[in-house]
């Protein structure tokens, strides 16, 4: 029970961070890219790239998760997202820029969808709906705070690279949370095996 409680808190943190990122980018990406020197019409196309990346992240991530470890796929997604967001602060060729935005979309939107799959595996059927519902409820706070924090960041008129570095922080925290979940669950499985022996 103690292990389940700690893992639940870590899941809440992961979903919270994922939704901070989903809604911060979904609401403010065009403005961030305008601040980075791109015109508005191009910046709106970036939003399309973000959502296409999210769709591909969910599909490809799901495919990989069925063949490999889901936690490792999630950590790879969120880590890639953090790197992609930091790279956005540099003057990149347009193709690489679109790719980085798509990766950020895969990490935020795709990562959040895969987190639900991970939670579904963790909770037994009699408490699954409660576990997922509570995690998504906590995550909603992230969905509210994400756009507010991003708007506040932009109002500070900081150098644009600071904004993208700040946006990469939720990805890094999500990597740490998912890693801790994976390690705790692995330790529990080993302890159960030891008792069975």
Task: Enumerate the predicted regions with their spans.
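Helix-loop junctions at membrane interfaces in 12-TM secondary transporters
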Residues: 89-100
């Amino acid at each position: 029970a103690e292990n389940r409680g700690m893992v639940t808190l870590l899941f809440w943190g992961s979903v919270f961070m994922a939704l901070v990122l989903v809604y911060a980018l979904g609401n403010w990406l065009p403005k961030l890219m305008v601040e980075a020197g791109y015109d508005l019409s191009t910046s709106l196309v970036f939003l399309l790239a973000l959502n296409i990346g999210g769709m591909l992240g969910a599909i490809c991530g799901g495919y990989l998760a069925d063949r490999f470890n889901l936690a490792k796929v999630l950590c790879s997604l969120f880590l890639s997202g953090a790197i992609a967001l930091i790279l956005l602060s540099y003057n990149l060729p347009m193709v690489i820029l679109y790719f980085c935005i798509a990766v950020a979309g895969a990490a935020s939107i795709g990562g959040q969808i895969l987190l639900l799959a991970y939670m579904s595996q963790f909770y037994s059927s009699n408490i699954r709906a409660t576990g997922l519902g509570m995690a998504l409820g906590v995550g909603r706070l992230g969905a509210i705070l994400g756009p507010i924090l991003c708007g506040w960041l932009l109002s500070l008129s900081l150098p644009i690279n600071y904004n993208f570095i700040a946006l990469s922080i939720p990805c890094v925290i999500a990597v740490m949370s998912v890693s801790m979940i994976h390690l705790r669950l692995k330790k529990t499985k080993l302890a159960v095996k030891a008792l069975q022996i």
